[in-house]
């Protein structure tokens, strides 16, 4: 998950999701979520990408005005076993890229190999 500094300007925080996602709280296994926030007068964009090989049932917590967001899932891991998952997080100064550009980044990330 990602959390900006405590003095983020809460009224300027907003989120962006893939085309068709209207309620992030009810959506599972979406490919990405993005956030725009302002800190000390500077605007930032954060893109959080989830790999398609991640455990299923993942939900994004991406609605808080103070900027904390991330992806969460539940999984049973037996003693001696491990669980692999992959997320990409990109932070940039300025405005978020357009939804289509973030989708292109997500599509490229989804083609990377996750080591098991």
Task: List PLM regions with ranges.
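Trp/Gly-enriched beta-strand surface patches
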Residues: 1-76
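Beta-strand-rich recognition/accessory modules
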Residues: 44-116
């Amino acid at each position: 998950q990602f959390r900006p500094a405590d003095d983020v300007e809460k009224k300027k925080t907003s989120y962006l999701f893939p085309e068709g996602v209207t309620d992030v709280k009810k959506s599972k296994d979406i490919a990405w979520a993005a956030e725009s926030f302002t800190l000390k007068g500077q605007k930032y964009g954060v893109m959080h990408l989830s790999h398609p090989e991640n455990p299923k049932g993942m939900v994004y917590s991406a609605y808080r005005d103070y900027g904390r967001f991330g992806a969460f899932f539940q999984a049973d891991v037996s003693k001696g076993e491990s669980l692999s998952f992959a997320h990409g997080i990109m932070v940039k100064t300025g405005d978020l890229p357009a939804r289509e550009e973030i989708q292109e980044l997500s599509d490229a990330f989804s083609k990377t190999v996750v080591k098991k």
